[in-house]
Design a protein with these regions (language model features):
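Catalytic phosphate/metal-binding cores of nucleic-acid and nucleotide-processing enzymes, i.e., regions
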Residues: 140-171
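Functional cleft and adjacent loop/helix regions within the main domain
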Residues: 14
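Intrinsically disordered, low-complexity regulatory regions enriched in serine/threonine/proline
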Residues: 1-11, 23-140
């Protein structure tokens, strides 16, 4: 049975849209960025023990260890969230997970699907800095093909030949 942190991390990153080959264990989720880079994502407490209010992202070189570390506070990403009808939180609450005597749960405010997507986007933007863009450009960028045709003789026929070959390549 997975724990609360694993469930939340899997919900955020298990679809492989932000990280490849995600694996969640304990308070951490691991994934692949490219051939040599991995990422570890953890819920951490930044201010009060037992209040997990941030995600710590560690980019790891699989041979040489840590490359970069970033802490993304949920309150910075999502802002304070209103708790209607609760006089204790008139100005809202920064989303965080708390340790309620050994039971971990969201405190006062449970993130919406839009909130989860906002967190995914923030994490994705940070990790994009480290991704190998060569493969992406190859897949999504314009294609350039050289087709050799003699420019002497029947030039019109040679141009027609080149156009036909180009259409074959791009279909």
């Amino acid at each position: 049975m997975s724990n609360f942190f694993e469930q939340e991390l899997w919900y955020l990153f298990g679809d492989e849209q932000v990280i490849d080959t995600p694996y969640c264990s304990g308070q951490s989720c691991y994934g692949t960025l490219d051939r040599d880079l991995r990422v570890r994502i953890q819920f951490i407490s930044t201010h009060i023990s037992g209040q997990y209010d941030a995600l710590k992202l560690t980019v790891l070189n699989r041979i040489n260890g840590p490359v970069d570390i970033q802490v993304l506070k949920l309150g910075d990403i999502l802002g304070k969230k209103p708790i209607p009808g609760n006089p204790n939180f008139r100005e809202g609450v920064a989303p965080h997970i708390w340790d309620n005597y050994g039971k971990f749960e969201w405190y006062a405010y449970r993130p919406t699907e839009a909130d989860y997507e906002t967190v995914r986007q923030a994490v994705g933007r940070y990790l994009d800095v480290f991704r190998d863009r060569t493969l992406e450009r190859t897949r999504n960028g314009p294609k350039l093909v050289y087709i050799c045709a003699p420019l002497r003789g029947d030039v019109e026929q040679n141009i027609t030949f080149a156009k036909e070959k180009a259409q074959e390549v791009f279909q």
